[in-house]
Amino acid sequence: MPSISININLAFAAALLGMLMFRSHMMSSLLCLEGMMLSMFTLSTLTILNMQFTMSFTMPILLLVFAACEAAIGLALLVMVSNNYGLDYIQNLNLLQC
């Protein structure tokens, strides 16, 4: 395995570890989720270019589209929660209330 792939896998693992450690704040969780998506995009792009899969060149672009949608929805939820509650603590939210 080349050193670039090892570094990208380590970046994914670090973002996953950050997601598990800093799950009490919504902003930290969103940043770690974006780091995971960025490392997945880079790894999938490198894999497709190295293996020369001509039929799956659109897969990294599709992954970026889903990452952008996830970021937009996450930021909208963050703004809504911070406007309503004044905090981004996930423990203070009761998601069962309407």
UniProtKB/Swiss-Prot annotation:
Catalyzed chemical reaction(s): a ubiquinone + NADH + 5 H(+)(in) = a ubiquinol + NAD(+) + 4 H(+)(out)
Listed transmembrane segments: 2-22, 29-49, 61-81
GO MF term (any one): NADH dehydrogenase (ubiquinone) activity
GO biological process annotation, one example: ATP synthesis coupled electron transport
Membrane topology: Multi-pass membrane protein
Subcellular location: Mitochondrion inner membrane
Pfam families listed in its UniProt record: Oxidored_q2
InterPro entries linked: NADH_UbQ_OxRdtase_chain4L/K, NUOK/Mnh_C1-like
Claim: Transport is one of the keywords in the record: yes
Keywords: Electron transport, Membrane, Mitochondrion, Mitochondrion inner membrane, NAD, Respiratory chain, Translocase, Transmembrane, Transmembrane helix, Transport, Ubiquinone
An example Gene Ontology CC term for this record: respiratory chain complex I
Enzyme Commission identifier(s): 7.1.1.2
Function (record text): Core subunit of the mitochondrial membrane respiratory chain NADH dehydrogenase (Complex I) which catalyzes electron transfer from NADH through the respiratory chain, using ubiquinone as an electron acceptor. Part of the enzyme membrane arm which is embedded in the lipid bilayer and involved in proton translocation.
Subunit structure: Core subunit of respiratory chain NADH dehydrogenase (Complex I) which is composed of 45 different subunits.
Family label: Belongs to the complex I subunit 4L family.
Name of the protein: NADH-ubiquinone oxidoreductase chain 4L
